[in-house]
Amino acid sequence: MAKVQLRNEILFTAPTHIGLLADVTEALHNAGVNIAAIGAYDKGDKAELLLLTSNNRLTGDALAPLGGEVSIIPVVVAEVDNRPGELAVIARRLADAGINVAQIHASSTDSPTVTIVMLTSDETKVIGLLQDV
């Protein structure tokens, strides 16, 4: 059965430059913050980093000197079985319930579970829909 919860993810938006990822990850390391999930996107003149961390307050404090903007985004975090078709089951369930998935990123290794982070049109409803996946 899936472990599904509402979490707050950090969106860090900053001017794009070579080394930004290094700057961000070093700042978080120096603050003692663990990164549970990350997504990073180059949007031309700016970069967007999505960070699910062990401590959002420390994350914000650590990123502030880097000159970007820190926002909090409520997301659904689901830890599900690592097997073929698991994401298809989730995607179909959400589609059938009329829920839009605006953003998704996931991590997978050879471990028995996968962590999926989703920004949707109704996080509360998603949590209820995925409890038995």
Q: Model segments located where?
A:
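A conserved regulatory-domain signal marking ACT and ACT-like small-molecule sensing domains
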Residues: 1-133
